[in-house]
Amino acid sequence: MKKTVLSTILLCTAVVAMAQPAGWFGGFQIPEIKLETSQEWKDVNYAGDDQAYHTCDIYLPKQTKESYPVAIHIYGSAWFSNNSKGMADLGTIVKSLLEAGYAVVCPNHRSSMDAKWPAQIHDIRAVIRFVRGEAAKYRFDTHFIAVSGFSSGGHLASTAATTNGIKQALVGTIEIDLEGQIGNHLKESSMVNAACDWSGPVDLTAMDCGEHITMGDNSPEDVLLASKLDKEPDKYLSLSATNYVDSNDPPIIIFHGEKDNVVPGCQGKKFFELLKAAGVKTEATFPAEGSHGGPAMYTEENLNKMVHFLEEVRINSTNAKTKQ
């Protein structure tokens, strides 16, 4: 298998990422742009602790309504950045969601330098509970909450979906707390109705399933877990969204490029097959020229597929509740 060693890049990334926006290592990112919104809030603390890594930006669609369905979109950074919400695919994924009528929440989360796994999923679940707890203030319609993410953000979105409703799990010999105790809305649910996985590493036990760039002696997942796969495989299973797939998972749509050399496309393909086998509603697109982010991934066709999938799930969910 062809591999390129980038240990120097990893070292530099690890040093600067805690205070820097997501850059190349998190995939292709479009610089911060001005979105068309009716209202927005920046640097809202969702945990009540005054930490920058526990803040989020909230955007409401240009068309004003009493309330909006919600999409939480998480940036990619190989878990190295704790402050990249301002570059969370604003000109592509977030823009499309806003135009489709979704309130969009872009959160920061703790990096692998701030805390080890499962702190990151604790943060994302805190965001979901915050959305429910502060629904009246921000005009959120909590009957539908989707979670989306790119790269490591796709991993967190996928894991939030496949662990839906699971607060603790026994993975081999490891008992993992998936819920956490972050924020002021601990009585709220952290469940989601749908998820979008853009190029996410979802099986951290099999990152060598295809050609990809390696990051020297310590991969991003090694740093996140402070371990090695051959020493503590159960830790890597506990980090893998694929480990938790079952028939109770919400609908999940996957986008993964065939030419992705950061997170190989076989990750998305394995996820897709596992979801189908479990009977989960799922769709997947594997662009032939798609890399890790970039124009071949964020085409109008793919963005429309994402929106159509979420709308179909949302409408079907609404109709089902009406019939009850």
Q: PLM features: residue spans?
A:
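Bacterial Sec-dependent N-terminal signal peptides
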Residues: 1-24, 324
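Alpha/beta-hydrolase superfamily serine-hydrolase fold, recognizing
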Residues: 20-324
